[in-house]
Amino acid sequence: MSSLSLVEQAKKSAAYQAVDENFPVSAKVVGIGSGSTVVYVAERIGQLANKDSFVCIPTGFQSKQLIIDNGLKLGAIEQFPEIDIAFDGADEVDPALNLIKGGGACLFQEKLVAASAKTFVVVADYRKKSDNLGIQWKQGVPIEIVPNSYAKVIQDLKKLGAITVNLRQGGSAKAGPIITDNNNFLLDADFGAIKDPKALHDQIKALVGVVETGLFTSMAAKSYFGEQDGQVNIWSI
């Protein structure tokens, strides 16, 4: 078996175990995020016998498609602001279950769903584990901002200690900056190793023009990792 298929099997095992151990029997509203491991979360939830008894809230386009593809009932957070449990991936996780999220440009909706959930469970592969945020994930903290504030916010982030700040671009498919689902811009600010994610989040969030940061602190209850050797590793508070 190749190392890739071992990791892929571990991701599937981690996702299935996360659902089996945490999904409430009486759940009525379920948040489903995005990421390569969450694909298996949606698959497992789609196998539940009572899947017609709850609705699923997406965090973005990919998760909306996962919900539909697995025959699950699609809902909107505007209709269901109280979520029983949410599952999502992460770009980086530290031992205190602080997260960096937003590499896929959906951080606001991801944080809204996580904050609305009674229980928030992370599923990811071993590459997302880190002793400190900002070590494994080199691209920086994703920050959603109001478009006309970008020049000012970039200046302010550098005053807070950011080594580099980049306005995220759309790549070959789009000339110019990425536009989020909320019609905002995204910055990626590299602060190096982040010793106090909560304090940094608070400082960034206080800046005029900032809508939300990709620092998720004191939100996740558990994180399930698919390991390189095919095993599942669980971190919890």
From Swiss-Prot:
SUPFAM superfamilies: D-ribose-5-phosphate isomerase (RpiA), lid domain, NagB/RpiA/CoA transferase-like. GO terms for molecular function: ribose-5-phosphate isomerase activity. It is found in: Cytoplasm. It is an enzyme of class 5 (isomerase). One of its GO terms (biological process) is pentose-phosphate shunt, non-oxidative branch. GO terms for cellular component: cytoplasm. Pfam families: Rib_5-P_isom_A (PF06026). Its EC number is 5.3.1.6. It catalyses: aldehydo-D-ribose 5-phosphate = D-ribulose 5-phosphate. Pathway: Carbohydrate degradation; pentose phosphate pathway; D-ribose 5-phosphate from D-ribulose 5-phosphate (non-oxidative stage): step 1/1. CDD domains: RPI_A. Keywords: Cytoplasm, Isomerase. Belongs to the ribose 5-phosphate isomerase family. PANTHER family: RIBOSE-5-PHOSPHATE ISOMERASE. This is Ribose-5-phosphate isomerase.
